[in-house]
């Protein structure tokens, strides 16, 4: 449990690190109570909420021995979240109370006149629904430290009067993407490495929807004062498109040969987001500086 400016925050999670999907419906296999165990698979369930302002639900499953014969990673996850904005009445009332308190010398401590809890606005929200499917495998070339990963993901954004994305505030948007990643890790310890390096590179791409949907994005949703602006926004961002590139490198060098010593870590990270069509840039999946 926790306490934030929007009220009480609660979080409940369950993680099983020795789960067995194969034993789930087999009563003759190993169980702990009603839970099938013994395969080293991971099952996670989570819920987080602070009442009407925010709810989040997620479930995921992963295994490092998909098929049971080779070290092949497989993962699957689903999630849903909803965030609700604060009514503009809150800011009006907060300013008025601050002004009156300044003029009269009274404090509003102990009163709920300016608490977020009193200004929940159901007409301002963001809902996110998604699922992902992942696969990974060790490589033998160029050496045994390399791994290859692939992930297919889908996310649906549902917005109403949401003012935080700038380009898009009301409507539904879909994101279907594929991520290819390669990683090389040669550190001597996962938690406190003294030697080795960790390199990773990935690219995430969506289909170039604008290449074949025959829409004039140059003149679509350009005038906020137009009566059709909201509907044009929904048409423009129904399917978002982009390509995202990431690179990360870290090296670790022990400064002495002693068992306990200082370790020098060098690090570099790079990220790039591009668009297929300069008139259809994604309001989501961007970098924030």
Whereabouts are the PLM-identified features?
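C-terminal outer-membrane beta-barrel translocator/porin domains of Gram-negative envelope proteins
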Residues: 1-7, 13-15, 165-289
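Gram-negative/organellar outer-membrane beta-barrel architecture
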Residues: 1-192
């Amino acid at each position: 449990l926790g306490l934030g400016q929007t009220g009480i925050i609660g979080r409940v999670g369950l993680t099983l690190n020795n789960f067995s999907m194969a034993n789930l419906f087999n009563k003759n296999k190993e169980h702990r109570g009603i839970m099938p165990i013994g395969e080293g698979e991971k099952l996670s369930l989570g819920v987080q909420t602070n009442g009407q302002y925010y709810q989040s639900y997620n479930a995921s499953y992963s295994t490092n021995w998909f098929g049971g014969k080779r070290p092949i990673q497989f993962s699957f996850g689903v999630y849903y979240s909803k965030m609700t904005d604060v009514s503009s009445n809150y800011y009006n009332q907060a300013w008025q109370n601050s002004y009156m308190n300044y003029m009269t010398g009274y404090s509003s401590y102990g009163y709920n006149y300016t608490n977020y809890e009193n200004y929940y606005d159901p007409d301002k929200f963001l809902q996110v629904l998604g699922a992902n499917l992942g696969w990974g495998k060790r490589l033998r070339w160029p050496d045994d430290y390399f791994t290859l990963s692939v992930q297919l993901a889908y996310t649906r954004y549902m917005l109403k009067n949401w003012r935080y994305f700038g380009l898009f505030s009301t409507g539904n948007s879909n994101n279907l993407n594929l991520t290819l990643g390669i990683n090389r890790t040669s550190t001597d310890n996962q938690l406190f490495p003294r030697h080795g390096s960790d390199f990773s590179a990935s690219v995430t791409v969506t289909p170039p929807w604008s290449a074949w949907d025959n829409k004039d994005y140059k003149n679509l949703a350009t005038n906020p004062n137009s009566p059709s602006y909201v509907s044009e926004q929904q048409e423009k961002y129904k399917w978002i498109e982009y390509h995202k590139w990431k690179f990360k490198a870290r090296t670790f060098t022990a400064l002495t040969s002693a068992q306990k010593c200082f370790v020098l870590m060098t690090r570099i990270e790079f990220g790039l987001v591009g668009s297929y069509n300069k008139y259809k840039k994604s309001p989501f999946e961007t970098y924030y500086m």
